[in-house]
Design a protein with these regions (language model features):
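N-terminal, polar/charged subdomain of small-to-medium soluble alpha/beta proteins
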Residues: 2-149
Length: 149
């Protein structure tokens, strides 16, 4: 396989500096679109403290998936796109599982669900506990994963 054609792209320069550039690969990239599930709130058994094991807490989950547009387009066919319903059902099942200690663990599981469809190239998961600190709307994490080429 031959190396991709590379052309230099000039960078912004500071006053008095010499121009610099670096090669940028010129490769064809598939057309993509985004699927977003925003602010899905579910009760979960989550937390590291003993008092958190006896009750459920509200957790807000948001997911963004960058999806490869199929060759020839979608054609208004549900079989040519990832299932939104499958994602929501997977999140509900995740919320009903046994106690989880960390929101980071939940975010990893959310990414596993999102990346399960082969058309998904990249996924972002945001997981927030809503009722932890009285002076904050939430505390949370944001994880991102890309499919390896």
């Amino acid at each position: 396989m031959s190396a991709p054609n590379r052309s230099p792209i000039p960078l912004v320069m500071r006053a008095g500096s010499k121009p610099t550039s670096f090669p940028v690969a010129e490769t064809a990239r598939a057309a993509t679109y985004l699927i977003r599930l925003r602010h899905f709130v579910v009760p979960m058994s989550i937390g590291v403290y003993a008092h958190e094991e006896d009750r459920h807490q509200r957790v807000r989950i948001s997911v963004e998936m960058e999806v490869e547009l199929p060759a020839g387009g979608i054609g208004d066919e549900i079989g040519r796109v990832p299932s939104y319903e499958g994602l929501v059902e997977g999140l509900q099942a995740l919320a009903e599982k046994e106690h989880v200690r960390l929101i980071e663990t939940v975010a990893e599981h959310v990414l596993d669900l999102a990346m399960a469809h082969p058309m998904v190239l990249r996924a972002v998961a945001e997981v927030e506990k809503l009722d932890v600190f009285p002076d904050a709307e939430s505390i949370g994490v944001r994880f991102e994963r890309r499919r390896e080429d």
